[in-house]
Regions:
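Glycine-rich phosphate/diphosphate-binding loop of Rossmann-like nucleotide-binding domains
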Residues: 12-57
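Structural motif
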Residues: 23, 56, 80-82, 116-122
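C-terminal binding/interaction regions
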Residues: 96-171
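Active-site rim loops that border cofactor/substrate pockets in soluble metabolic enzymes
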Residues: 47-76
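Short, ordered loop/turn segments at secondary-structure junctions
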Residues: 28-29, 86-88, 122-128
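Glycine-rich phosphate-binding loop
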Residues: 65, 69-107, 111
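SAM-dependent methyltransferases
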Residues: 1-21, 166-171
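Conserved active-site and cofactor/substrate-binding residues in soluble primary-metabolism enzymes
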Residues: 17, 32, 36, 40, ...
Length: 171
């Protein structure tokens, strides 16, 4: 929920570059692949001066549980950003693209309702098989998504910091 001091639900004195906490909420399915993305995210953040111990890892059973946990975390006021990570694959029982769409739509609602930025690292491949070639491809791809998420988090938080710091124009 937005605070009186900031339209973004956090104290503007605590952008990520100044030590604000980031929640990384991840699904447990395909943990090794999602872990690779989270590790790449943390490494990219550390390269830019954000310590790894300021990133809280929160696990949920599957992707479907991520939005509610993200909303509960945003409501604590402890986080300047939340990153969601999952690999949503076609298990042959239901349409995985529906699950991924539902999760991403819910994550968008969380950030709009709480004004805490939420970032998606949900991969939804058309085809995924448990063999070495696919696993290696998606491990590498999730690492790329982790680095991209770090860029997005830092860019967004810097934009918010500048917006909060900008002089107000009388209406």
């Amino acid at each position: 929920m937005p605070s009186p001091s900031s339209p973004f639900g956090h104290n503007p004195a605590h952008p990520a570059s100044a030590g604000g906490r980031i929640a990384f909420v991840q699904a447990c399915w395909h943990r090794d692949i999602v872990d690779a993305g989270r590790d790449a995210f943390a490494a990219a953040m550390a390269e830019r001066g954000h310590p790894a111990d300021a990133i809280d890892r929160i696990e949920v059973p599957g992707a479907f549980e991520i939005p509610l946990r993200a909303k509960l975390l945003a409501a604590t006021g402890r986080y300047v950003a939340i990153v969601a990570g999952a690999l949503v694959v076609d298990g042959g029982i239901y349409r995985h693209d529906f699950v991924a769409s539902t999760v991403v739509d819910a994550l968008m609602r969380v950030q709009l309702e709480t004004c805490v930025p939420v970032f998606s690292m949900l991969l939804t491949p058309h085809h995924f098989h448990e063999h070495g070639t696919h696993r290696e491809f998606f491990l590498a791809h999730m690492r790329t998504k982790g680095r991209e998420a770090a860029d997005a988090v830092l860019g967004t938080l810097e934009g918010h910091r500048l917006l909060v710091a900008a002089p107000r124009v009388a209406a």
